[in-house]
Design a protein with these regions (language model features):
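Vicinal oxygen chelate
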Residues: 1-4, 7-16, 44-47, 65-145, ...
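A short, acidic/glycine-rich surface segment
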Residues: 41-42, 61-66, 130-132
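Short beta-strand
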Residues: 35-38, 74, 100-102
Length: 145
């Protein structure tokens, strides 16, 4: 099986005003607030045609600043396949990355920063991967939040 980075999966926005942001995506764009994994931080997922395309993270109760290098857009995500191959590629190139499994889900992720500091999230459906074990390692602190 080869390596492929597919279509845009979703984008993530860190906000200090979750309610107004949810309202905008519902009222203005017509998205629907829907199910979200039980992450350790508050937020909301907004759906289009049954797909969570906008992830919102509430940072209003933290001292966490909005990243100046990416503004309110935190990362860009792509549906992908070839999890092990991508990890090998990143390691061969000497690139720091973070891999993890979504809590309670069948989704594996790799996070890596582009040369401009934009975080790229690569999502892999575990059932479609030919690897024996779920991701557990952490390479540097690229992180999703």
């Amino acid at each position: 099986m080869g390596i492929s980075v597919g279509v845009l999966d979703h984008f993530n926005i860190r906000t200090r005003n979750l309610a107004d942001t949810v309202r905008f995506y519902e009222d203005i764009l017509g998205l629907e607030k829907g199910a979200r994994p039980n992450f350790a931080f508050p937020g909301a997922w907004m759906y289009s045609e049954g797909k969570a395309v906008v992830h919102l993270v509430d940072i209003s109760r933290t001292e966490e600043p909005q990243k100046p290098d990416s503004g309110v857009v935190h990362h860009v995500a792509f549906a992908s396949y070839g999890f092990d191959g991508m990890k090998r590629r990143l390691e061969t190139k000497g690139m720091a990355y973070d891999s993890r499994q979504v809590p309670g889900g069948d989704l594996w992720q790799i996070f890596v920063n582009d040369p401009n500091g934009v975080m790229i999230e690569l999502n892999y459906e575990a059932a479609k991967e030919q690897t024996a074990a779920a991701p557990s390692e952490r390479r540097d602190d690229v992180g999703a939040r």
